[in-house]
Amino acid sequence: MKRKHTKWICLGLVLCLLTGLALGCNSSTNKTETATSEDTAQTTDQTTETTAAAAAAPDGNPSADMGGRPDGNPPADMGGRPDGTPPGGMPGGPGGMGQPPAGGPGGGPGGSSADIEYKGAVKITSADSQSGQTYASDTADESALLISTGDAVTIDDATVTKSGSSDGGDSCNFYGLNAAVLVKDGADVTITGGTITSDAMGANGVFCYGGNGGRNGAAGDGTTLTIRDAVITTTGGGSGGIMTTGGGVTYAYDLTVTTSGQSSAPIRTDRGGGTVYVDGGTYTSHGLGSPTIYSTAEIHVANASLTSNLSEGVCIEGKNSIELTDCDLTANNTKCNSNASFFDTIMIYQSMSGDADSGTSSFTMTGGTLTSKNGHVFHVTNTNAIINLNGVTVVNEDGEGVLLSVCDDGWSGAGNVATLNAKGQTLEGLLLVGSNATLTLNLTDGSAFIGTVSGAITNAKGATVSTEVGTVNVTLDGTSTWTLTGDTYVTSFTGNASRVITNGYTLYVNGIAMTGTK
């Protein structure tokens, strides 16, 4: 009996041991499967986050502060090589640096110039001087003339023709692929006289690439282009007249530039920005999304005629600037481009695409004539803009008579803020300030404003944008006047009430009717 019990006890122990091993293996298997599932989920989450981050990443266009931009200023006589001294009559301009409404320069991530195989029908790679030559290319992604050297090059009375479209996209916009004439790698190039003609997609006329393919804030490699007395004509889309990117420096004198394609500003900049000085000449655009000037840079223009026949007159994106001195600017914006839902002559905005840093945009105009044939004279959206006007003749031919609108449009991510500084200026029209917008109006040095403020805004597509006025702050010095053309509501008023001519209407400040007005 004892042995039988012992036998059964041993059998029981064996069964328990086998059962335990089986359970242990099963438990281990379950843990392994669970861990694998968690690892897979974690990997999936990481992949999703990485992909989302990549999709949301800025595409690396110029940073707008241009803190390290080339410091070359135009030559004193506007006739020789740049010597660092601003010419007489050429504005020094603000130090701040900043795609027209969709369809303009820029876009998604654009890689780098190191990824591009540059080709030229004629290549100049050392110091040279050529006159009366013909340069031609009908090959895609090939320039007619490629100047790639750190030396000085002079080209006189050239005939340049470029055909052969490119699908290079941002490689054309940012780095100069397929341009009729491409100047890069620290070259110091002077082009005088001659004609430059391109009839292809992505074929800018003359492209000055400063080597900094990233966002603004980094200096270029010293590439400098001086071009004078030349005729530039482009007909394809994405084909500006004179194009500056990557911190390049361009000086243009007495040019005749005509563009016909979409996204083809006669004076055009893109990723990496740069500095552009223009004195004299005629600049005309006929295409959609092709203002006469598109700024992702610091641009100064004097004594020039600027005409846009379909698009805005000029466009500034982000923390960038345009300064006009004694220019005649005319725009007839009759077709909205992509996200845009207003017609306007001066467009200041931020797309949040990464093509320009966010910050204060600056438009300054002194003297000259500003003619707006259709839409609002000024339109500010999704950015902080400063508009300086001094002795400008403003002609508003649009029936609605809107001088300035500050409100939502087709972009979001930043506020709608504008400051209008009028000095010795006569202004007339309606100021539209959306319910989530802020306008500061400063009238000084004998300025006169005839008009009112409203928050009732409908865009060109017929959609209601705002029904109530936002924040409006007005400062009126002792030499300036404001004549009302309707009951007006502002948030604050600084100045002598007697300088406000009510004209039978009432000015309300923070909801209270102002007294002491005329």
Task: Locate predicted features.
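Bacterial signal peptide processing site
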Residues: 26-28
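Surface-exposed loop/turn positions within long extracellular repeat scaffolds
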Residues: 468-471, 484-494, 508-511
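Extracellular, surface-exposed repeat architectures
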Residues: 504-518
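Surface-exposed loop/turn motifs in large extracellular/passenger domains
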Residues: 114-132, 147-165, 172, 177-198, ...
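C-terminal motif of bacterial Sec signal peptides marking the signal peptidase cleavage site
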Residues: 21-24
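Disordered, low-complexity segments in secreted/periplasmic proteins that are enriched in proline
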Residues: 30-115, 212-219, 352-355
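Beta-strand-rich domains and repeat architectures in extracellular enzymes and scaffolds
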Residues: 136-149
